[in-house]
């Protein structure tokens, strides 16, 4: 089964030894705890930005070199990869107890959630693929312009 995150993605965020301690002493890339934490993180991100952005495209797993004409192209948004790992690791640490979560891990989790809130609300622009309306072929937007002022007619 192809997954969005690769084993090599974790190397920039956490040492392999610590990740093995969190997931058990088995092959940690196939570990059920890790898979569940990744799925939870992806669901959390989808819930925050899914109304504006095409999450099916964002979370598309990498194609293997055999499926991609012999080339390994990483088309994933690296910021999304980073915050997915941050949220995944926070969930893995959380199962050990709230006092055992390192401060930097809690801060990175909170930063990721704050960014997702801002992007989901439209306060922070990003270059993720927007949802396209099949009828108009334009990006779906829920932007509405209104005013609390009553309309004025100044014609005399």
Regions found by a protein language model. Give the residues of each.
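Conserved short "hinge" loops at termini or chain/domain junctions
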Residues: 1-77, 138-156
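Generic beta-strand or strand-like secondary-structure segments
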Residues: 40, 44, 83, 87-91, ...
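Ordered, amphipathic secondary-structure segments that act as subunit-interaction surfaces
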Residues: 51, 73-94
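Short loop/turn elements at secondary-structure junctions
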Residues: 90-156
